[in-house]
Amino acid sequence: PLADVNKIVEKNIKKNKVKEDKLIIVDFYTDWCGWCKRLDNETYKNAEVAALMNTYFYPVKFDAESRDSLNFAGVPYKFKPSGSRGTNEFALTMASRPGGRIGYPTITIISPMGEKIVVEAGYKNADKMKLFLLYYGEGHYKTKDYITFEKEYNQKQLTD
C-alpha cells in the first residue's frame, strides 16, 4: 500500500486546524527498540511534552522498517531489504547521521518544504525533550546554538 505522507500531513492540518508553516517532527522507531518504547511510555506521556509537540509541530511516528512505499515532498520512498530485515528509504534519507548510520530512536525535524533541519539520535527524558522542542519550535535554532540556548533557558528558570 502507498502511504502519501503529504496527504496525511494535509489531512491532519485540516483536522487539527494547525498552521501549514509548522515544522514536521518525525520519530523514527522500530518494534524491537527498547529505548523507543521508553520514549513512548515515559517522555511522550508527559503533558508538557505533548503540549509543546502539538503547539509547534506536526508530529509523525514512522516505523523505520516499514515495508510500505510512501511519497514525501514529491519524492517516492520504498522499503530496502537487508538480510532478514531492512529499512525504508524514507528513514535512510531523513534519519541517517553523517556516514549513513541510523540509531533508534531518532527524531528528525523537517521544514514544511521537506528539508531536514536536524537529526537527533537517542532517548530523551521529558526535561531534555521539552528543551529540544522549545529550541526548534520557537525558532531559536535560527539565531543561536543549542548550548547557548540551554544556558539562557536554565538561567531564566532560576530567576523565575
What are these regions (language model features)?
Residues 19-34, 59:
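Short active-site neighborhood of thiol/selenol oxidoreductases, capturing the structured segment around
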Residues 8-12, 44-45, 90-92:
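N-terminal post-signal-peptidase region of extra-cytosolic proteins
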Residues 1-3, 111, 116-160:
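Non-globular targeting/processing and membrane-anchoring segments
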Residues 23-25, 102-106, 141-146:
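Surface-exposed patches in mature extracellular/periplasmic domains of secreted proteins
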Residues 47-49, 54-118, 131-139:
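Thioredoxin-like thiol-disulfide oxidoreductase module
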Residues 43, 47, 123-126:
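Short, conserved loop/turn and helix-capping segments at secondary-structure boundaries
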Residues 37-41:
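Detector for the c-type heme attachment site
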Residues 1-23:
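A short beta-strand-turn-helix
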